[in-house]
Amino acid sequence: MPHKVSLSRLKLTDFRNYAAAALALDGRHAVLTGDNGAGKTNLMEAVSLLSPGRGLRRAAYGDITRVGAAGGFSIFAALDGMEGDVEIGTGIETGEETTARKLRINGTTAKTADELTDHLRLLWLTPAMDGLFTGASSDRRRFLDRLVLSLDPAHGRRASDFERAMRSRNKLLDEGRFDPSWLAGIEEQMASLGIAMALARQEMLGLLTRLIEETRETSPFPSASLQLSGFMDGQFSRPSVDLEDDYAAMLAESRYRDAGAGRTLEGPHRADLIVHHREKAMEAERCSTGEQKALLVGLVLAHARLVGNLTGHAPILLLDEIAAHLDEGRRAALFDLIDGLGGQAFMTGTDRAMFSALGDKAQFFTVADGRVFE
């Protein structure tokens, strides 16, 4: 069983609808119940900001600060982390117009948010993700990249560096500045970063596919088959240096076409995650809404197991409205599966009775009017 990473304290100040809130946690799962709009998902969002990025809502930091607050917002958490006990504080200060937040770990200012991954890994599933299989390919790429990040924290930096290089190339092409040596330098950088991104995605899908196959007979959820499409399909068994050379050549050959289109038409930023329901031999986008939800839950929980297996530390799960639309039997099977992962899960719902199968495996909190209490 992997080491259980768990929060013991969570304090919020001027965060969303909370002027101040504090949770004392005992390491069990945390169930947050209350009416719609009470602020349950806001608490989950606060926990999600203990990972790199903008959290489960991907909101601008200025939008997170409580309306009417004099300053910014702050989040404090104490936890038994991957390297032992740790205290994490993050937020923005009064009047800041910023795309970055301040971050302190054990009282010391962190150089980058990537340092958070030394202490915990966070995975989440929210109702906003229910349309993942039928929505835009960019949503599926973002989903896949978060899966990769949980095992390869450098993936985020590679992706942002690739985007930066691609914007530079697009700007040169848009301005008609076809300097061969300048463009070649940028395209070589894009090729190195882009192929590294694609290979990291392929590796994640391979690991996840094997684990899904191994647990297929015991999972209460349908199994997914996964593949990437839209960028150098079927070529990733070749040496990476050859792939980089080919992609750089592809970019060089497509300069005038990309200039006309106003964007780069080939690359990992155009790839798509294709998911099939294995038992039905059907594309996920053609499955019923309920089948899509079950596929997604199974996929996220399989990934959580993979993270625990490979890192030795169970991730913290944020499962928003996870029990909605499941019958009693499937809810009980879901809770058994979550508990069997060995980590701490935060779950939300409107009805406490929906979580009765958890028994004493969970702490129960009521959320109402910007307050949280047991």
Swiss-Prot record:
Top-level taxonomic group: Bacteria
Pfam family, one: SMC_N
Residues where ATP binds: 34-41
GO biological process: DNA replication; DNA synthesis involved in DNA repair; double-strand break repair; SOS response
Cellular component GO terms held in the UniProt record: cytoplasm
Protein location: Cytoplasm
InterPro entries reported in the protein's UniProt record: AAA+_ATPase, DNA-binding_RecF, DNA-binding_RecF_CS, P-loop_NTPase, RecF/RecN/SMC_N, RecF_2
Role description: The RecF protein is involved in DNA metabolism; it is required for DNA replication and normal SOS inducibility. RecF binds preferentially to single-stranded, linear DNA. It also seems to bind ATP.
Full protein name: DNA replication and repair protein RecF
